[in-house]
Every structure is written in structure tokens, then in C-alpha cells.
Amino acid sequence: MKVRASVRKICENCRMIRRRGKVMVVCSNPKHKQRQG
């Protein structure tokens, strides 16, 4: 899980979602998981 100020899609499988007010990126590739912080 990467914590970044600006999250963005890395590949076409990445999906932007909101969980508990935080923007997150989930993907089939675990390296692409990101959270805005």
C-alpha cells in the first residue's frame, strides 16, 4: 500500500474508490494499491 498526496491509475485494471472519505486505488496488481494521505 502506497500512501500518496496524489493517487492515480497506473494501469487499465486500476480502479478509483472512496472508503471512509479516503480516495484509494485498488488493482489486480498488489503493487498498484494506493491510498491518499
Curated annotation (Swiss-Prot):
SUPFAM superfamilies linked to this entry: Ribosomal protein L36 (SSF57840)
Pfam families: Ribosomal_L36
NCBIfam families registered for this protein in UniProt: rpmJ_bact
GO CC terms, sorted: chloroplast; ribonucleoprotein complex; ribosome
NADP in keyword set: no
Highest rank taxon of the organism: Eukaryota
Protein name (database record): Large ribosomal subunit protein bL36c
Species of the source: Staurastrum punctulatum (Green alga)
GO molecular function, one term: structural constituent of ribosome
Biological processes annotated in GO: translation
InterPro entries in the record: Ribosomal_bL36, Ribosomal_bL36_sp
Family as reported in the entry's similarity comment: Belongs to the bacterial ribosomal protein bL36 family.
Annotated localization: Plastid, Chloroplast
Chief localisation class: plastid
Keyword annotations: Chloroplast, Plastid, Ribonucleoprotein, Ribosomal protein
